[in-house]
């Protein structure tokens, strides 16, 4: 399986503990493409369609029509994890550079790499 940074797949994130995002849901691959090429794992961020959640600076909204989603959704950059690529199933879409710039900014905030 060839996985690229910016790809969105369905993945089964179960089992979970506490407030972790779980179940079969879309995830965004945020790992660099060298890691994606050589590692059996991928670093991903969970995506939810629960857009009424509190808007955090670590959230990036996805327009369903523009990116081929069934519903408007939110990328949760505070919900990142490393998963085996075997958890990835169907590819949904690939996010463009404009969207990935927003993801990068939210990720930097999540990891305290920039002041907020």
UniProtKB/Swiss-Prot annotation:
PANTHER family tied to this protein: ENDORIBONUCLEASE MAZF, ENDORIBONUCLEASE MAZF-RELATED
Outcome reported for the amino acid change (mutating residue 56 to A): Not toxic in E.coli
Keyword line: Endonuclease, Hydrolase, Nuclease, RNA-binding, Toxin-antitoxin system
Keyword Nuclease: yes
Family annotation (InterPro entries): PemK-like, Plasmid_toxin/cell-grow_inhib
GO biological process: mRNA catabolic process; rRNA catabolic process
Residues with site note (Transition state stabilizer): 25
Stated consequence of mutating residue 73 to A: Not toxic in E.coli, 100-fold decreased RNA-binding
Effect of residue 21 to A: Not toxic in E.coli
Further comment: Replacing all Arg residues by canavanine yields an enzyme that recognizes a longer consensus sequence UACAUA, thus altering its substrate specificity. Still cleaves between the first and second nucleotides.
Annotated consequence of substituting residue 59 to A: Not toxic in E.coli
Name the UniProt record assigns to this protein: Endoribonuclease EndoA
Family note: Belongs to the PemK/MazF family.
GO molecular function: DNA binding; RNA binding; RNA endonuclease activity
């Amino acid at each position: 399986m060839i996985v690229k940074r910016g790809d969105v797949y369905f993945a089964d994130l179960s089992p979970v503990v506490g407030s972790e995002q779980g179940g079969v849901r879309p995830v965004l691959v945020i790992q660099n493409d060298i890691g994606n090429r050589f590692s059996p794992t991928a670093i991903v961020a969970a995506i939810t369609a629960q857009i009424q959640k509190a808007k955090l600076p670590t959230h990036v909204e996805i327009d369903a029509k523009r990116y081929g989603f069934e519903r408007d959704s939110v990328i949760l950059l505070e919900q990142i994890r490393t998963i085996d690529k075997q958890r990835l199933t169907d590819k949904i879409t690939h996010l463009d550079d404009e969207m990935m710039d927003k993801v990068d900014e939210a990720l930097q905030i999540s990891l305290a790499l920039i002041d907020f």
